[in-house]
């Protein structure tokens, strides 16, 4: 039987996942992180994108987070995020529309254009599409 670590994924709405996992893969500010049992303690920011949990038995579950924090302790991994969605619940067509709208907004900047907000919308839509694509690969 593979070694496991307890993982909690929590959003502003409440607990989304709680259980034993063999591996957590998340997108941190410095790149992808793979967290396995026995990982060194760590706290880091997370970028918008997929979080992949490899559960006992090797099955994978993919979530989308809008960004947040990852805390690793000897027997626990905790993900704190503003927004969490199961990848299966994401609408790929809607994410593609949001991506196009954000790209158009960046191209049509006017006098009161908020570049930071437009770039954030673009990054979020792109991260949702990456999450959907990653979920498809895992199937």
UniProtKB/Swiss-Prot annotation:
Which cysteine-cysteine pairs are annotated as disulfide bonds in the entry?
A: none
Q: Name one Pfam family in it.
A: ATP-synt_DE_N
Q: Write out the GO MF terms.
A: ATP binding; proton-transporting ATP synthase activity, rotational mechanism
The reply on keyword Transport is yes
Q: Name one GO cellular component term.
A: proton-transporting ATP synthase complex
Q: According to the lineage, what is the superkingdom?
A: Bacteria
Q: Identify the keywords attached in UniProt to this record, alphabetized.
A: ATP synthesis, Cell inner membrane, Cell membrane, CF(1), Hydrogen ion transport, Ion transport, Membrane, Transport
Cellular localization per UniProt: Cell inner membrane
Q: How does it sit in the membrane?
A: Peripheral membrane protein
Q: Which family does it belong to?
A: Belongs to the ATPase epsilon chain family.
Record note on quaternary structure? F-type ATPases have 2 components, CF(1) - the catalytic core - and CF(0) - the membrane proton channel. CF(1) has five subunits: alpha(3), beta(3), gamma(1), delta(1), epsilon(1). CF(0) has three main subunits: a, b and c.
Q: Summarize the protein's role.
A: Produces ATP from ADP in the presence of a proton gradient across the membrane.
Q: Protein name, please?
A: ATP synthase epsilon chain
Protein's organism: Pseudomonas putida (strain GB-1)
